[in-house]
């Protein structure tokens, strides 16, 4: 397998969306962040382990959550044709994605990742673009 690590500690992690908090950011201790949690696929697990990233095991699946502070702007979202699309293109769960993430710079944060971009490789079956206006 070709090493997917790029310059400046950027990594491409692949898997299936579990929690999508791009349009309605998470708020924790007064800090708002865009977050995306995915179940990593086999290649994603290998890359995360190789780079010492913080993952969680849930019901036999290896998950990773990447974050981005709201003040940095929403991460860009792309479709499978690599065209930039609206964030509503990303389903709340089930889509197969590639996340471009950056490892934390501080030694104590090196296991965490910061979300840069997301590409939807395959839409979840039976799931359409989400209409957030209902909230």
Where are these regions (language model features)?
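Residue-level recognition of well-ordered beta-strand positions that form the cores
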Residues: 37-39, 100-102, 117-119
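Beta-strand/loop nucleic-acid-binding surfaces
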Residues: 63-88
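Exposed beta-sheet edge/beta-hairpin loop segments within beta-rich domains
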Residues: 80-97, 103-112
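Extracellular structured ligand-interaction cores
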Residues: 33-35, 94-98, 115
